[in-house]
Each structure stands twice: as C-alpha cells, then as structure tokens.
Amino acid sequence: MSHLDNGFRSLNLKRFPETDDVNPLQAWEAADEYLLQQLDDTEISGPVLVLNDVFGALACALAEHTPYSIGDSYLSELATRENLRHNEIAESSVKFLDSTAEYPQAPGVVLIKIPKTLALLEQQLRALRLVVTPQTRIIAGAKARDIHNSTLELFEKILGTTTTTLAWKKARLINCTFTEPALVDAQQMLSWKLEGTDWTIHNHANVFSRTGLDIGARFFLEHLPGNLEGEIVDLGCGNGVVGLTLLEKNPEASVLFTDESPMAVASSRLNVETNMPEALDRCEFMINNALSGVEPFRFNAVLCNPPFHQQHALTDNVAWEMFHHARRCLKINGELYIVANRHLDYFHKLKKIFGNCTTIATNNKFVVLKAVKLGRTR
C-alpha cells in the first residue's frame, strides 16, 4: 500500500498483483505526481482520457471528471477498479476502453503514461489524432530514462508541436499540441512467416516480440509435448504460436488461449483463423488475469512463457500468480510446462508450489521445466 497526495484527492493505492513485503513496489511513480501537478481542477472541460494508467493512480485522482481509462492491460483495469473501491470511489466514475476501441471525440485533456512498447504508443497516438483538437491539452509522462528522442519524434510526427520539461524526481513530461502534421499511413499489424511452417503470424501493436519469434519461445516450441488430450491452456498466449503448435501436435486436445492483453488475444484468434481454421472448434479465447474465475481441476496441461516485468518494473509477481492459478486449475496428474531465463530460478519456485519440478531441456540462456499436480492440497 502506498499513499499519494495530489491536488485532487488523497489516495491509498496498491499494486495488482500485490508485491510481497520483502520487495515492496509502490503503485504510483513521480510521473503520476508530475502529470497531476499540471492540471487545475477548475480548468478541465470536455472528456478526460487517461492512457496506460498501470494501477489507476491518475484515474482515481481524476474520478470527479469521469475519465476514460484506455490501455491494453486487463490487469491495469482490475488494479484501477480495486483502488477505486479501496478509496471509496464509485467504480462507475471511470469508463474503461481497450486500445482498439474508438476514443471519445474532442477530449479536453489527454494524459499518457508512456508504455514499454513503442508500437503501442504509436497506435494510441494515431487513434488520438482522429479525435483531438488544437485545444486539447496533451501531456505524457514517464521516468526520464524512458523518454527518448524516438519518443519525442513520434509525438511530433503524429500529433504536432512537442516540447519536454526538465526532470523532476527523475520524471519528465512531454507537452504536445495538435497541429495536424501530414502523416503517412503505417501498418498497424506486423506479419511474418514462422520458420519451419506454412504459417503467417499476425501481431497487433502491443504483442510481445511482434517483429519475430523471440528466442525463448523458439526454444519452447522445440520441446512442446505431443501426447496431450483433453483441455490444455496457452497461458499468457501473446500471438498464440505456442497454442497453434499445440493444436497441430495434439489433434485430440483443445486449447484455451488466454492473456491479460486484448491485443494478444485478438492476435491469437486471428492466427488460428488464418493458419488453422479447421481447429477453431477446438479453441477458446479469453482476456483474463491468468486463470481467475476458471474452475479448478479442469485442465490436463498448462503451458506458459511467463513475463518477468510489469510495464517498466522488473517483478516475478505476475509469473508467481500464473503458477498458482495453473496448479489450482490442473487436474490431478496435470502438467505445467514453462520456459524461462535460467537466472530466474523458477525451478525452486515451482518445486515450492507443486512439490516437484523436472528440467526438460536447457541451453546457455533458457530452461524448459515441468511440474506435476500430485495432490489436492494447496
């Protein structure tokens, strides 16, 4: 829990998933403070748009103005809702949109937290270009180290006149005025051929490693099981290459593709539709926080390439939650397969949760691990 005083309201905020007491991370940063300092409560008119508000600090502070919270993270929506409830603010005070939705016309204020993925920022700026006016106040913020020349050039190219502030508490802001610069259309989705297959993999803006198969996933694909039946899960599916490969190697199995990113789930669905349309009746697609709300003892196997960051912060809390959800939802003798960087030492984490762990394969950077659900405890 962390306390944020600002010119709008005093807030107690927490991260989602919550961090442990040993490595506490707060649910807001100096850039949130800096952004809120720029606004005068009496001067806000027209719709307020807040983009990439990871834990809801901005949306909660501006709740009296009924802001739109826009992003590509279901975890961020859950965090914002939880922080609204915790601060006794009506959840209806904030309207949630994902980044593929149409943005409200003629906003008065747009606050942007710079996302980790530059392609997502470009997609969002192009969407804003369709609705902002020269009178819209557009302010973006991030840690100073995360604002680069390429970031400024993107604002200048898509929206117009762009300036930056001095650093304050290691945060910087970008001020932008819409001047309708001439703009060349850009491809919002990237596609590439998956080596060793006839498949074309399509990737929306915020999909991890959208320009090509990442080396961890490549290593994982080489060691996926081929003797599975029943229901299995591609957990944190991204563009769905793991699930696609599972569908091909396991014709008696069905696959749940799930991710907290709406763009990832949309990419997975598109990739099944275009590469294995005959397998669509063996697929389910879900935007979710890991396997929240999914019934226990359902799946024969869960496969996962877990993240070790949440936006710009390095953390294993998301992976830890994925592992616990996987164990809850596996049948007895069900199997969890993961690929991870060796230095993360997930072997001992899985052994703590499952009581067992086996190394399937390893190279100088990655390891593929398997854990089996052996009993009904935990």
From Swiss-Prot:
Mitochondrion among keywords: no
SUPFAM superfamilies linked: S-adenosyl-L-methionine-dependent methyltransferases
Signal peptide: none
Catalyzed reactions per annotation: guanosine(1835) in 23S rRNA + S-adenosyl-L-methionine = N(2)-methylguanosine(1835) in 23S rRNA + S-adenosyl-L-homocysteine + H(+)
Keyword set includes rRNA-binding: no
Listed EC numbers: 2.1.1.174
Keywords: Cytoplasm, Methyltransferase, rRNA processing, S-adenosyl-L-methionine, Transferase
A Pfam family assignment: MTS
Location in or out of the cell: Cytoplasm
Cystine pairs: none
Main location per the UniProt record: cytoplasm
GO molecular function term, any single one: nucleic acid binding
One Gene Ontology CC term in the entry: cytoplasm
InterPro entries given in the database record: DNA_methylase_N6_adenine_CS, rRNA_m2G-MeTrfase_RlmG, RsmC/RlmG, SAM-dependent_MTases_sf, Small_mtfrase_dom
Role played: Specifically methylates the guanine in position 1835 (m2G1835) of 23S rRNA.
Family assignment from sequence similarity: Belongs to the methyltransferase superfamily. RlmG family.
Entries under PANTHER family matching the protein: RIBOSOMAL RNA LARGE SUBUNIT METHYLTRANSFERASE G, RIBOSOMAL RNA SMALL SUBUNIT METHYLTRANSFERASE C
Name the UniProt record assigns to this protein: Ribosomal RNA large subunit methyltransferase G
Source organism: Enterobacter sp. (strain 638)
Species classification: Bacteria, Pseudomonadati, Pseudomonadota, Gammaproteobacteria, Enterobacterales
Gene responsible for this protein: rlmG
